[in-house]
Amino acid sequence: MAKKNQLTTSEHLDYQEYERLLQCLHDDGEYKWEMYARLSFCTACRVSDVIQFKWHHILNVPSVNVTEKKTGKTRTIPINPSVQKKFREMYILLGRPDMKDYVLPSTQGDKPITIQRINQKLKWFKSKYRLKIDNFSTHTFRKTFGRYVYETSNRSAESLLLLNKILNHHSIQTTKAYIGITQDEINGIFNSIQF
């Protein structure tokens, strides 16, 4: 695990593995961590933004406005009815916290959880649930979102353009590297051409 302010390399989870993680967390009553995984995926936000969410920001709203800490850019993220419903279910499972509370509180409650603590727990969940991922960190769910969009859009160039905008990357190359598109995958596309 990286130390504070140290760069890390993380990977995306295959979507089926992501769903398995959600089910394991749910079955074990790890609702706070299930909520973290869902919120990170559904918003595609960086962890520095995710930990700032309070319940009134995300519950029973059609969209979330986020001013990204890293870029200073503001994004409006739609929260579709299915996601709204799941967030309400999680809110109830978490004991209906005050709407002004952080979704992911620290043990003190009046502050959000730390990024270091999240990474510690993710490392623990990786081991406990035997997740098929080498580098599991706070960036994993954002990358999983990106890979999910790319895969469900049939690996289209349009999906890369959309992801580039959603993730606020400076270039398509950054987006490709971010979601784990490898040279082998690119070669595979060219090698699949048949006449």
Where are these regions (language model features)?
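Active-site-proximal segment of tyrosine recombinases
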Residues: 49-50, 146, 154-168
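Basic, Lys/Arg- and aromatic-enriched nucleic-acid-binding interface segment
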Residues: 2, 15-43
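DNA/chromatin major-groove-contacting recognition/catalytic segments
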Residues: 9, 82, 156, 180-195
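Conserved tyrosine-mediated DNA breakage-rejoining catalytic core shared by Y-recombinases
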Residues: 52-83
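Short pre-functional
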Residues: 34-46, 64, 147-152
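Short basic/aromatic active-site micro-motif
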Residues: 133-152
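Active-site/catalytic core of tyrosine-dependent DNA strand-transfer enzymes
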Residues: 82-133
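Catalytic-site neighborhood detector that most strongly recognizes the C-terminal catalytic loop/helix
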Residues: 68-71, 167-192
